[in-house]
Amino acid sequence: MDAILPVPVDGFRFDTGSGSCCKPRNNLESGTTNRFTCFNESESQSNPSPTESKVCSDYLPVFKYINDMLMEEDLEGQSCMLEDSLALQAAERSFFEVLQDQTPISGDLEDGSLGNFSSITSLHQPEVSEESTRRYRHRDDDEDDDLESGRKSKLPAISTVDELAEKFEEVLLVCQKNDQGEATEKKTRHVKGSSNRYKQQKSDQPVDMRNLLMQCAQAVASFDQRRAFEKLKEIREHSSRHGDATQRLGYHFAEALEARITGTMTTPISATSSRTSMVDILKAYKGFVQACPTLIMCYFTANRTINELASKATTLHIIDFGILYGFQWPCLIQALSKRDIGPPLLRVTGIELPQSGFRPSERVEETGRRLKRFCDKFNVPFEYSFIAKNWENITLDDLVINSGETTVVNCILRLQYTPDETVSLNSPRDTALKLFRDINPDLFVFAEINGTYNSPFFLTRFREALFHCSSLFDMYETTLSEDDNCRTLVERELIIRDAMSVIACEGSERFARPETYKQWQVRILRAGFRPAKLSKQIVKDGKEIVKERYHKDFVIDNDNHWMFQGWKGRVLYAVSCWKPAKK
C-alpha cells in the first residue's frame, strides 16, 4: 500500500536555525508542508452517540496520521523498524560473545535446556534437516505460496485513485461503525467455516493440544529426540497455520520446538517475519486497534495523563523510549491544539534502537518528519530530536533538557526487549530505568505485557508461554475479522515472534524477556520512583470505551496506580504512572 499513489511530499525542508531542542546535526525546524485531506469530519460524525464520539476522537488523529504515511512513495521497500533493531541487537551480542569466548550465564541453562543440544545430536543432523523438514513442512508450502502470492497480487489491484480513496475511507471511517452485532455474526460464521474446513483435512479425533505440547517440551528438555519428534508428528496432524486458535497454537509452538531441537533458530526475527514491510504493519495496526483495545488503552491512559499534567505548561518535552512510528502522539497533538490558552511548544525526543546499515537513525528521523507535518496541521509548535542507540549506552549528556519545561518519560511495551541481569551482570534493564530517574521527569509513563515466561528454566518458561499465548490466540480468533491475512499478520507480529524467541533461544539470542507487573514495580521503585495514582475519570472513561466498543470478554480494572487489561480474567497488560521519589 505504500505504492498505492506515488505522490511525493513537497515543501518540507530542514533547517539549523535557533530554537531547536537538540544538537545541530539532527535538528528539525519548522517548514511548510502540503496538507492532504481525504476525510470530512463533519460529514462522517453526524449525530454520533456520546460514547461513539469519544471513541472517534481517540481514533481519528491516528488514522489521519496513517493516511499521511500511506502517501509516502518509498514505503514499500521498508521493513518493520522494531524487527530490524532487535535482529541487529541480537547479532551484535552473539558476535561479542564469540569474540570474548563467552558462554551464556549458567542460570539461563538447566538440565532440561538445549543450549548444547545441537552438538549432542550432530550425528543425527542429516536425518533431521532432510527427512524431518520434508515430512513436516512440505504440507504448508502451498499455503505459504498462496499467502505470499495473494499479498503481492493485491498491491497492484489498488493502484488507482478511486480505489485508494475507498481504502482511505475504510481506514478513516472505521470508528464510525457501530455494528457489533453484525461483526459478531461475521466472526461466528468465519470461525465455524474455518473449523469445518480444517476438520476435513485433520483428524476428527479431539486432542488436548496443550498436553501434547507439554509432553513434547518435556521430551525436548530430557534430550529424548525420538520421543520429541513422535510428539511433533502427532501435533502437526492436528494443527495448521490457518486453522482455529488451538490449531494455530499447536502449529507455531511445534515450529519453535523443532527449531530448538535442530538448533536452526539463532535469529528468530528473520525466521518469523521475513522482514515485514511497513505497508503490512499499517494494515495489521489498523485491524488490531479496531478489534482489540489493548494498545489503544495504553495510549489513551498515557495521553490523557500527560495532557492533564501539561494543562498549563508552556513547553512540554516528551522523551519517548521506543517511539517507533509515533502512532501514540497524533491524539495528544490534537488535544494540545484545543487548549483554551493555546498549544504549548511540544518537544519530542524520539529514542530507538539503531537500524542495520549505513544510516542507523534513518527510521527515527522519518518519524520526526511525520510528526512535524502532523503538528503543522494543528498549529502546534514542534521541535524534534532523535537518538539511535542501545538504551543502556545512552547517558544524560545525550539529552537536552531545559529548565522550566514539563518533562515526561514515556516507555510503552518496549522495556521487555531490554536485556536483564541474566544476560549481563550490569543489567541493561536496570541501567535504562536509572537513566529514566536521572532525567528527573515530572512524570514517567510505563506500560508492559504482564508476562510470567521469563524463567531461566526452559520447561517453566514454556509452560507459562503456552498459557499466555493461548489467551492471545483465543482473543484474536474471537475479535479479528475474517480477513485471514490480517489476522495471520497480527499473530505473527504480536505472538509468534516473541514465542519463537522464548522457546527456541537461550542466552543473548532470547530477546523477549517479559516480567509481571509486580516484578516491574520492584524494579521501578528500586530505580528511585514513587507511584502516581491514576485519575479516576481516566479509568472510568477507559472502561466505558471498552464496554461500548469492544468484545464483552475484554476486562479493564485498576488497583491504585495500575490499570490492568485482560481477556477472560487473565491480565495481559498493565499501565502505570510514576514520579521521582525525590524531585
UniProtKB/Swiss-Prot annotation:
Q: Does the keyword Zinc-finger apply?
A: no
Asked if the Swiss-Prot or TrEMBL record annotates the protein with the keyword Hydrolase, the reply is no
Function description: Probable transcription factor involved in plant development.
What keywords were assigned to this record?
Nucleus, Transcription, Transcription regulation
What is this protein's gene name?
SCL30
| Name the UniProt record assigns to this protein | Scarecrow-like protein 30
Motif VHIID, per the record, lies over 316-320
Provide the species name. Answer: Arabidopsis thaliana (Mouse-ear cress)
Annotated region (PFYRE) at 407-501
Instruction: List the residue ranges of the region (Leucine repeat I (LRI)).
Output: 207-266
**Where are the stretches annotated SAW?**
504-579
Can you say where in the cell this protein is located?
Nucleus
Q: Name one GO biological process term.
A: regulation of DNA-templated transcription
Q: Where is the composition biased (Basic and acidic residues)?
A: 131-140
User: Partners and quaternary state?
Assistant: Interacts with SNRNP35 and CYP95.
